[in-house]
Amino acid sequence: MNIKQFFVPAGKPLSGLAVGLSIFLTALFLVNNLVYPINEHLLLKPDSLFKFDLNRISLYPLAHLSFFHLFFNVISTFSMIVMFEESHGTLYTGVILNLLAVFTAIPYCLIGSLLFPNVEIGGASGWFFSFLGYFAVKESRVRNSVMITSTFSFPTLYFPVALLFVTALLAPGSSLPGHAIGLLLGYFMGLKENWVAKITPPSFVLKKIETWVDPLINLIPFGIKYYREVEVDRSLEYTSVYLGSESRLPLHNTDTPAEPTFQGNGRVLGN
């Protein structure tokens, strides 16, 4: 697998939301530590749902508690957002990020009010697990397993679950319930993406919004791509993030050597 493709698809500029969000998260972290403790108004509390505190319910992914917390979340979510944004559009991806935050917060608050009423959470790692679950569903339809070593493979669909528990072991202070809820939402989004589309604004609304803010979109620097609604087609089939000869694996063993297959021009997700 070509890891570079996760960050900078060949011959393509960086995606606008992925870059902008990374910069914004960093700026908020600096403001919180140097200017004003903004995290006090962003961290999600289990009682936030019952107080109808919309700031905390939707904005808690923006709050980070340490530099390493910020660094690992920016690095892990960047590639996921790049891939999703390229195939779904910048504005639509922003809507999805907000929906994921809200629909993760609701069950977290319900569970947390009973089991851990005094625990606050923040950070974008829930987004990472949601997108990880989403891409695992899509990838599992192309590759049923991922090669870990030359002799050991792991089911593609359950790889995020393994990573969920590894993360809990390596970072015991992280929110396992929040990550698990985010992962379940990602699985749901991958399995029922047409259902998710029904709770997002219609395409014509997104196009209208982009028309209104077009002067601002045109200010985006060269080398950073804003994927407009008119440029994307969310009905296109998923393309594996694995490149070259690994892009498809057989689902069963065969005793006869496979005949050479035509190697067409591959494309990165969303092209």
UniProtKB/Swiss-Prot annotation:
Membrane topology term: Multi-pass membrane protein
Alphabetical list of Pfam families matching this protein: Rhomboid
Active site: S125 (nucleophile), H179
Places the protein is found: Golgi apparatus membrane; Golgi apparatus, cis-Golgi network membrane
GO terms (BP aspect): proteolysis
Catalytic activity: Cleaves type-1 transmembrane domains using a catalytic dyad composed of serine and histidine that are contributed by different transmembrane domains
Transmembrane intervals: 16-36, 64-84, 89-111, 115-137, 152-172, 176-196
Alphabetical UniProt keywords: Golgi apparatus, Hydrolase, Membrane, Protease, Serine protease, Transmembrane, Transmembrane helix
GO CC entries: Golgi membrane
One term of GO molecular function: serine-type endopeptidase activity
Entry superkingdom: Eukaryota
Region ranges (Disordered): 252-271
EC number: 3.4.21.105
InterPro entries, A to Z: Peptidase_S54_rhomboid_dom, Rhomboid-like_sf
Keyword Nucleus: no
Purpose: Probable rhomboid-type serine protease that catalyzes intramembrane proteolysis.
Family label: Belongs to the peptidase S54 family.
Protein name: Rhomboid-type serine protease 2
UniProt source species: Kluyveromyces lactis (strain ATCC 8585 / CBS 2359 / DSM 70799 / NBRC 1267 / NRRL Y-1140 / WM37) (Yeast)
Upper classification of the organism: Eukaryota, Fungi, Dikarya, Ascomycota, Saccharomycotina
Gene giving rise to this polypeptide: RBD2
